[in-house]
UniProtKB/Swiss-Prot annotation:
Pfam families: Pox_A9. Glycans are attached at N84, N89, N97. It comes from Vaccinia virus (strain Western Reserve) (VACV). Induction: Expressed in the late phase of the viral replicative cycle. Residues 1-22 form the signal peptide. This is Virion membrane protein OPG135. Keywords: Glycoprotein, Host cytoplasm, Late protein, Membrane, Signal, Transmembrane, Transmembrane helix, Viral envelope protein, Virion.
Length: 108
């Protein structure tokens, strides 16, 4: 992997993380607005509900990022295996061609 590819993947990953972080903040603002209307902002239950909601949102984000990275790793592994298989098939075909050429060129 070239350096440029690694940098682009890193920047792309950070950008996706920022988008996910913005989505979580937006959900938190909507959720906090709802809780402030129904619960007092300084009550114990408000703090507990807010903490649980934050943990669930970050858990979903972590699982999603883990799933994306595993899919990317599987895709890279499959591409590497496909390339190795095609290279070995080409070398086998070359060996067959050599043997047929050698058998045809033998003196009779």
């Amino acid at each position: 992997m070239s350096c440029y590819t690694a940098i682009l993947k890193s920047v792309g990953g950070l950008a996706l993380f920022q988008v996910a972080n913005g989505a979580i903040d937006l959900c938190r603002h909507f959720f906090m607005y709802f809780c402030e209307q129904k619960l007092r902002p300084n009550s114990f239950w408000f703090v507990v509900v807010r903490a649980i909601a934050s943990m669930i949102m970050y858990l979903v984000l972590g699982i999603a990022l883990l799933y994306i990275s595993e899919q990317d790793d599987k895709k890279n592994t499959n591409n590497a295996n496909t390339n190795n298989d095609s290279n070995s098939n080409n070398s086998n075909n070359d060996k067959r061609n050599e043997s047929s050429i050698n058998s045809n060129s033998s003196p009779k």
